[in-house]
Amino acid sequence: MALSKVKLNDTFNKDQLLSTSKYTIQRSTGDNIDIPNYDVQKHLNKLCGMLLITEDANHKFTGLIGMLYAMSRLGREDTLKILKDAGYQVRANGVDVITHRQDVNGKEMKFEVLTLVSLTSEVQGNIEIESRKSYKKMLKEMGEVAPEYRHDSPDCGMIVLCVAALVITKLAAGDRSGLTAVIRRANNVLRNEMKRYKGLIPKDIANSFYEVFEKYPHYIDVFVHFGIAQSSTRGGSRVEGIFAGLFMNAYGAGQVMLRWGVLAKSVKNIMLGHASVQAEMEQVVEVYEYAQKLGGEAGFYHILNNPKASLLSLTQFPNFSSVVLGNAAGLGIMGEYRGTPRNQDLYDAAKAYAEQLKENGVINYSVLDLTTEELEAIKNQLNPKDNDVEL
């Protein structure tokens, strides 16, 4: 079956229908929620650090603390605006630092804690108690603890949020099937940080963020906007650079936008994502133009800013035992598909097109502005005749 016979889903009709809606939905975040301001950012960073230095730390609350830290970087005012713009009715709790007295082995001790409704003073005190035990052990081993190994290192909060950036890429599955991939990726990109902190346990921290995002979906909205703001801010630490790379990979792929609909145009995004998987090659341009119309916030950052990379992905899989046409953003990435194709006509058409590409090498490479290295890589992938490559 020819590609021209495989029609794009009725995305545009649905878009028109949604655009005519005169009403908005209001959601509730429940009871009072904690929205910290900039002034407690340092304390929240230290809380993250205490968890990181604690050997065999209990990360039950790490996801929550990480999100509170993210909100403190955005600031109270912007966090409230994000939630209200997303349709949430918010009753916000102000967060301050207070002194808390707690009995420790029969002795009363003082701790500086935050006035949080989501995390009791006792839990915060216990986090510090456990971290002190690990810190004493570090002092014995090292003699003096270097700044980058301490609980108050300024990048502790961002280290925790790097794991959140990995989790957010997997929420599209609707379950925790992506946990193994998150752990593997974290072990790779955060390997230096794991040498610094014995409490940096990717599996436990990832599960904590899964729990937070599943239980409090409004945190997804906050995290996406935080990620955009953080990634667009120049400068910063090495870990901030790692975070930006991880987050923009997730945002660019559009998976979170398309599946969860965390922004204003959410439903349109979901439809476009599912419809574009059924798109034929001749309609890729049509989908691309639709992406331009919606703008980067719709989850099309990757193809709008790097169409070359997306087009190159068409040629990356020379063996088409099975083919899926279209990626979430609608540019038609072709990759191997395991299992029975849901659309046999689409499968046959995509497979035929891919084999034709591989056999003939009829791609206008000149429009891709390839470097010498990229061109060589593509030639090796497709093994085209030299005169078939248009430079």
Swiss-Prot record:
It is found in: Virion; Host cytoplasm. InterPro entries: Pneumo_ncap (IPR004930). Keywords: Capsid protein, Helical capsid protein, Host cytoplasm, Host-virus interaction, Inhibition of host innate immune response by virus, Inhibition of host interferon signaling pathway by virus, Inhibition of host MAVS by virus, Inhibition of host MDA5 by virus, Inhibition of host NF-kappa-B by virus, Inhibition of host PKR by virus, Inhibition of host RLR pathway by virus, Interferon antiviral system evasion, Phosphoprotein, Ribonucleoprotein, RNA-binding, Viral immunoevasion, Viral nucleoprotein, Virion. GO terms for molecular function: protein serine/threonine kinase inhibitor activity; RNA binding. The keyword Lipid metabolism does not apply. It comes from the Viruses. Residues 1-364 are annotated as: Involved in RNA synthesis and encapsidation. The keyword Ribonucleoprotein applies. Tyrosine phosphorylation modulates viral transcription and replication. Residues 244-290, 338-364 are annotated as: Interaction with the phosphoprotein. One of its GO terms (cellular component) is helical viral capsid. Its main location: virion. The modification Phosphotyrosine is found at Y38. One of its GO terms (biological process) is symbiont-mediated suppression of host type I interferon-mediated signaling pathway. Belongs to the paramyxoviruses nucleocapsid family. Encapsidates the viral RNA genome by forming a left-handed helical nucleocapsid that protects the RNA from nucleases. RNA replication depends on the availability of soluble nucleoprotein. The encapsidated genomic RNA is termed the NC and serves as template for transcription and replication. Together with the phosphoprotein, sequesters host NF-kappa-B in inclusion bodies (IBs) thereby inhibiting this host defense pathway. May also act as a modulator of the innate immune response by sequestration of host IFIH1/MDA5 and MAVS into IBs. Homomultimerizes to form the nucleocapsid. Binds to viral genomic RNA. Interacts with the phosphoprotein P. When in a monomeric RNA-free form, interacts with the phosphoprotein (via N-terminus). Interacts with protein M2-1; this interaction allows the association of nucleocapsid with the matrix protein. Interacts with host EIF2AK2/PKR; this interaction inhibits EIF2AK2 phosphorylation of EIF2S1 and blocks EIF2AK2-mediated translation shutoff. This is Nucleoprotein. It comes from Bovine respiratory syncytial virus (strain Rb94).
